[in-house]
Structures are given as structure tokens and as C-alpha cells.
Amino acid sequence: MSKHILVTSALPYANGSIHLGHILEAVQTDIWVRFQKLIGNECYFFCADDTHGTPIMIAAKKAGKTPESMIEEVQKEHYKDLTSFGVEYDNYYTTNSEENKKFSESIYLTLKKNGHIVARNIEQSYCEHDKMFLPDRFIKGTCPKCGAKDQYGDSCEVCGTSYSPKDLKDSYCSICGTTPVLRESKHLFFKLQDFQNQLKNWMEEGNRLNEGAQKKLQEWFTSGLQEWDISRDGPYFGFAIPEEENKYFYVWLDAPIGYMASSLNHLKDERKFNEFWKEGKGEIVHFIGKDILYFHGLFWPAMLMGSGYKAPSQLNVHGFLTVNGEKMSKSRGTFINASTFAKYLDVEHFRFYLACRLGSGMEDVDISFDDFVSRVNSDLIGNLVNLVSRVSTSILDKMDRKLGILSTEGKSLVSELLSKETEIREAYVSRNYSKVMRDITGLGDKVNKYVNDYAPWNLIKTDVEKAREVVTTSLNCAKILFTYLAPVTPKIVHSLADLFQIPNLSFLNLTETIENKVLGPYQMLSKRVEEKNITIMITETKETFEKSNPEKAKQDPSKSNTNEVKSATVSEDGFITIDELSKVELRVGLIKEANPVEGADKLLFVKVDLGEKGIKNVFAGIKASYTAEELVGKKVVVVANLKPRQMKFGLSEAMLLASGKDKTLSLFVPDRDASPGDLLK
């Protein structure tokens, strides 16, 4: 029996362009939704632009536009960029809608009626020049702890200290530069603590959150839930609060309600809407980043509980996107906009690469462009695409492009691939995409070995029917492999369906074979990544930043003196702090493969399974102490977040820990049973 699922991804804020960090979540969600549809479930995918708040109001003023016209332009740009990466929404809406306004007002009034809203006067910064109360991020000054200048009103970007805007020294309004004054104002608060027990019970029911997210929520429960300020003083771009004068809903109140507005706008039918949001006849699944867990794991479900709606069925929480182990940087050219990436590189390659890196946990997703090139060219193009192209062009032409029937050997190989279906389905459901990609490429290796063993390009010269048999087996296997891959690379899979002369590749027709059939013309499925395009993309990103921010470009920390960097991280006595030690991510790894490296006396090439972190390739200088054979199956300790290093023989993505010298090296191994990916503490 098919399921009914409503899926959302977090709403992009309407004050900037879509970048690769946004694409991570959009693609992660899209893969999951496509999979659900491919197995026959009814699944809707809703999103919207998050359009309210002071930053929108100020940005529009600087641009000489109304907030309404600006957010309309940005929403069109966002939709274009997101869909260019193959993200297929059922509705991409806006929070500045009539539906959202009505839902926000009715939810608030219900909460107020039920005693969950309280009014209280608070003191906050006010700019007499701009005649407005200032949000924390519109106040700047000197950090009260480290003395760093030009820091925001809520935290210091230099030392990391959090504080109140009142604690800033030499504070000023970031809009006009004048010194703000303190004024008292009435604010409205949502009594989140009223729902502590309900929220705990909700969290513990079923499989709502991954382990990391559940632990984080438990920390907040332990420290006690606090009231939440849901109002802002005018002028403010947002929805006016009913029964109040010059008060507006804080953007984080109406933003998640945008999921409901987008749903109703698409479904039209209130009966269908209520099946999801009131009656619980369908599942509601949110995909979010770990930085907004507090809002989606506490405020949002509590608001729904207090106003007669169903809380989400599941929160899928992911980590941040990093590049080479570091935050994305505009000055280094790694803070890449989606439109810039799509201009120079194939977006389906990035979808595939993200799938290779994405597990089901909250760990940050680190990408390396060296690894991107290697994975795509080797696993996607060399392994999977090449499997199809090598038997679908001239060889198939020489047999009038007609397939034969599967031999006994062919049926056996097809059955082996089909036996992985349940495992692959389970991995997709749990969002463990990296496992799916490993399984697919592993099966692809087996099929390619079959093709190489028979060499149909030679066989066609002497035995056409045997060659037809080999090609028939190869392409039936390719149909299965690309069906498994269909949620990730829909464009490639669509081209393959055209080749097979069938409407689509779906899990619903997975077991159907293609025999005694004339195939369509072969169209190139995908090309290899050219490294020069990556260089051009990064250069353009850096140059764009430098032109628009000449002063910041001069202060690029990546160009600072190396001695200064060293002295900032290691103290004179040689000690490091616990914070510095915590940056090193040590995990248990299971060695899956080990091979000698041709032309290297000391190196072994090792593939290490790190669980949800995926498979890491490592070039380890341990050949004098270990044979390749004795390493396979061994559990070791791995530095998992080491910056990938391009070596002569390939990309090394991690480091094995060992002690000793030369021929007496001894690998660190867990003392007791441990699972791949376990974090050392």
C-alpha cells in the first residue's frame, strides 16, 4: 500500500543568491522525494522563499526598490537556480502570501486564546536617526572580551564570545553609523516551556530524528526551555500582529508556516490539506540544516501542538557544506554560487558527488574538487556510463541494434544485482546515500568485469550471437544499476530510458527485462569533468568578490604570513588547547581493500570504510610493515577530517594512525569491538 508524504526543505532567505550550501539540502531532499515517487508513493515536495525581516527591508531600501518587488525578483532567481540542479518542486512559493498571513494570524490567536502568549516590556537598542529598533545584527561595536572592532551585536567573530548588544563598546548603528540609545518596548512571548513534556514525548516517538539531533534536543530539555520573543517593532517588513499596534511577527514565526501556505496553495483542496496537517493521514517530513534545529525541533512543533495541527512526522537534519575541510570562502573562490557552477560544470555530476558524500547523520559534508573530479570521472563516467557506451554504439550497430535473450549466466548476474534492491531501498529511506553509491559502483565493477572477460568488441568478429548475448546481459544489468541511480541522476537516466525505448526507469519495473528488442540510437549520457573548468569557476568567483569587496580582499587571511598563522595555533611551550585537539576527527575505520601502488616502494593504497562518512581512499606508507592481504578486514584508527592531498599516485583523503619506525610500524586498532565510523572520544 502506497504512502502519502509531504516533504519540505528549508526556505532560502530572499536577500542573496543560491550557493552550493543551499544546493546540498535541495538535492538531498530531491533525491529522497524522487526515490519515494519511483517506488510508487504519493509524495509532494514543497518549499518557498523566506521573505520577511529587517535585512530584506534595508536591502530593498538600498537598492531603491520596494521590499515586495525585490523579493519577487529574488524568488524567480532562486527558483531558476535550484531547478537548474534538477530539483523538482511541486510548488515553490513565498512566505509573503495571503495564505501565510491567514495561517500566521490564526495560529497566533489560538495560542493567545489558550494562554501560551505573554506580554512583557524589554529594553533594546533604538536608532534615533533611522527611527527604528535595531536587531542585534544591525548593531556593531568593539567586542567586550577581546577588543576586536566592528563586531556584531550578538557575538564576536574573532573570539567567538556571545553577549548582549548592551555589552558592546563604542556601539553604532550599522545602517547610519550613529550611536543607538536604549528604549523600553512591549514585546510578545510564546511560552515554549508550556510544551516541554509534549515535545519530549514527540521526540521519543518513532524514528523522528537521527541520533545527533535527538541528543542536541535533549541538551535543551535538560537546561529548560525558555520563552521565545515572537514580536518586532515597526518599521518592519512582515505581517502585522492582530490586536496590537505597530507590532509585527518575528520572521521565524511565519517562516515555517510557509510550509503550510505552500501546501495549501498547491493542493487547493482544504480536505486534502487537512489530511496531512490536522488528521495525520499522511507523513510530514522536513529536511533542515543543523543550524536551525532549535526552531524546527522546538518552536515549530510546539506552535503546531498549541493550535490544533499535527507536529512533523520526521526531521532529517544534515551538517554544513565545507570545502577542503574549511568553511566556504569568497576570497578563496570556494563560496560558489549555483549559477556560476552550472555555467562551467555538469550539475548532475554534483548531484552524484553529493550523494557519494551524504550519510544519514549531522556530520558536515566536506567536498574537495580534486576528489570531485576523481569520483565523477572514475565511478560515474568510467564505471557506469562507460558500461553503457562501450556496448551501445558500434557493437550494437553491427547486430542491427537488436538484443537477444538472457543466457543462464546472464540471468544469474541479473539476479545478483536484483538481490541488492531491499538493501538499496533501505539506504535511500534512511538517507544513507553514500552507501547506495558504494553499492551501485561495486555492482558496476562486477558487470564491467563480465564485459571485459568476454570482450564483445572482439567477439563480434567471430560470433555475432554470442556477442549479442553478452550485450543483452550488459544492458539489462545497466538498466538495474541506473534504476538504482535514478533518484540521483534523473537526466542521465531519462536518456537511458530513450535508448531502451521505455517510458522510464522505475523501481516498479525494475525486474522487467529487455530482450528481443531493437534499441533506439545511443546519445552520449555524460562527459568527463575537465579540471580547467573548475579552475575557471574558482577564478571567476574570487575575481567577483575582489571587485565588489576591494577592502576585504586586501585583508584575505589566506594571504597572511605563515609564521603568524603558526604562532596563532601553537603556544610557545608547544602545548595545544582542548579546543584545538577537538578539531582532529579520529574515527574507527574498516579496511575494505588494500593494494600495492605501482612505482611506490613504501605505499599501499587502502580503501577504508568510515560508516556514514563513506569510503575514504588512503595512500599509507606502511608497505614495509604490512602486506596488502593482511590489512583487509582490519579495524584501524583514522584521521577522518584531514584535508585531502593530491599525490603523484592519486588523491589521499585520510590518514591511518601508527607508531614505530620503518619496518616495525604498528597500526592503532580498537581494543574492543567498534563499528566503522565510531568517533574516538
Curated annotation (Swiss-Prot):
Q: Reaction catalysed?
A: tRNA(Met) + L-methionine + ATP = L-methionyl-tRNA(Met) + AMP + diphosphate
Work out whether the entry's keyword set contains Cytoplasm. yes
Molecular function per GO:
ATP binding; metal ion binding; methionine-tRNA ligase activity; tRNA binding
A Gene Ontology cellular component where this protein is annotated is: cytosol
Its keywords, alphabetically, are: Aminoacyl-tRNA synthetase, ATP-binding, Cytoplasm, Ligase, Metal-binding, Nucleotide-binding, Protein biosynthesis, RNA-binding, tRNA-binding, Zinc
Give the subcellular location.
Answer: Cytoplasm
- What biological-process terms (Gene Ontology) are attached? methionyl-tRNA aminoacylation
Residue span of region Disordered: 545-566
Cofactor(s) required for function per UniProt: Zn(2+)
**Entry EC no(s):** 6.1.1.10
Annotated residues for binding of ATP: K330
Residue ranges annotated as compositionally biased, kind Basic and acidic residues, are: 545-557
Cofactor notes: Binds 1 zinc ion per subunit.
Motif 'KMSKS' region is found at: 327-331
Renumbered to this chain, motif 'HIGH' region spans 12-22
Can you give the residue ranges of the tRNA-binding domain? 580-681
Quaternary structure, per UniProt, is: Homodimer.
Q: What HAMAP family would the database entry show?
A: Met_tRNA_synth_type1
The entry sums up its family as follows: Belongs to the class-I aminoacyl-tRNA synthetase family. MetG type 1 subfamily.
Protein role? Is required not only for elongation of protein synthesis but also for the initiation of all mRNA translation through initiator tRNA(fMet) aminoacylation.
User: What is this protein called in UniProt?
Assistant: Methionine--tRNA ligase
Organism of origin: Leptospira biflexa serovar Patoc (strain Patoc 1 / ATCC 23582 / Paris)
The lineage is: Bacteria, Pseudomonadati, Spirochaetota, Spirochaetia, Leptospirales
